[in-house]
Swiss-Prot record:
It is an enzyme of class 2 (transferase). Belongs to the SHMT family. (6S)-5,6,7,8-tetrahydrofolate binds at residues 176, 180-182. The record marks 288 as: Plays an important role in substrate specificity. Pathway: One-carbon metabolism; tetrahydrofolate interconversion; Amino-acid biosynthesis; glycine biosynthesis; glycine from L-serine: step 1/1. This is Serine hydroxymethyltransferase. Signal peptide: none annotated. Keywords: Amino-acid biosynthesis, Cytoplasm, One-carbon metabolism, Pyridoxal phosphate, Transferase.
Amino acid sequence: MASLLDRYLRNISDKSQQNLASVAYLASLDHLLHAFPSIGQSIVQELKSQRSRLKMIASENFSSLSVQLAMGNLLTDKYCEGSPFKRFYSCCENVDAIEWECAETAKELFGAESAFVQPHSGADANLLAIMSIITQKIQSPAVQRLGYKTINDLPEQEYEALKAEMAQHKCLGPSLNSGGHLTHGTVRMNIMSKLMHCLPYEVNLDTELFDYDEIAKIAKEHKPTVLIAGYSSYSRRLNFATLKQIAEDCGAVLWVDMAHFAGLVAGGVFVGEENPMPYADIVTTTTHKTLRGPRGGLVLAKKEYANTLNKACPLMMGGPLPHVIAAKAIALKEAMTINFRKYAHKVVENARTLAEVFQRNGLRLLTGGTDNHMLIIDLTSLGVPGRIAEDMLTSVGIAVNRNTIPSDASGQWKTSGIRLGTPALTTLGMGSAEMEEVANIIVKVLRNITVRSNAESGSSKSEGELSEGIAQEARQRVADLLGRFPLYPEIDLETLV
């Protein structure tokens, strides 16, 4: 049987029309299918799977083939603990060049004073941010006050006392039910809650918006060392000038987690007081989601934190992933183009179109709409748990995720809502007309779900049903959309057996 690459080249005989990234990608698949068939087939099946669903999980996107190819090379074999030009290993000059370029690109793209590009994930970036703040604002002053040069010089008793003191400092962040993230410290199972005394702030239950006066009141009462702003399920923008003032009034460091909306900052959608960069002391982000890069994280900060961040090893990190840093650099360069700016604006336009259609059809959205890339549907009036809505939409080829809503009585497993996002569909080239169609499909599915409880195991094991007619119609409409907007159209899936 001819290889995937052979068939691709045969179908596109005009060399000027051949895509080098596709050639490289197909060649790598050919090798894996031959040398490690089970792994190769799983990759092919995942490609087929992602091509056969409308990806509407707000935290997911599609990276370019260039980004993917940058991760598949011998850079993965290089150990390079430390920071550029200050490594614990020799022969790192090429990795130094890549990491330096990546950091400089990040600084230029976001207008940051410093950039640390090594974190393996958003969670790692957040952990590094809080550890850097603790080191800079609590540990170092205490060590100096005690008359020592470094923390390693402290006698055991004084070291233990300092650790106890650090754990008493307060961190104020958004609760999980109000749209915050696990790593914002308000979930006790997460390590962040064990590093400081973490306190939550909530959205107003009537408006479902963050109440800055209430946040200021809590901050004034508790005087946190750190004020966290950001979200993973909140459909509006934040005013970072106001949040900065709240932080300054109580003497707190302002840390912004922009993992979800970094691409909207890079693309010039969030500007002025909606752009965290001029106001935050430290900003963390993932490089996937709206940035369309590889899975990874970044920490952007004021200059005073640069030295601490560059000592992430040994603070909390070991060896970085230079092959992923190379891919981050490519994604950041892609985000500096005019096409990316157009993309970022289209992401929000598409989300607003979805919201309009949902509301026109009687569905309730948290906060009454969206100003960013996501929206959350409150399913309470439909009597459909988020878990079942997720399952039923998945069954017709639409990937969303269940999501809690403020004061959610259903808990974090069942939930009373679902979260949807437009980054991936916008990457495929879909626009307002397609969003109308997608929203109408979702409305029809949600309104035709029948929930049946399992009497033996209780309501938590209830299941959803959808008539075959409704399901088949939805699948066909989804297939029609995906047929017009295929993932990686330069790769012919018919050749992927």
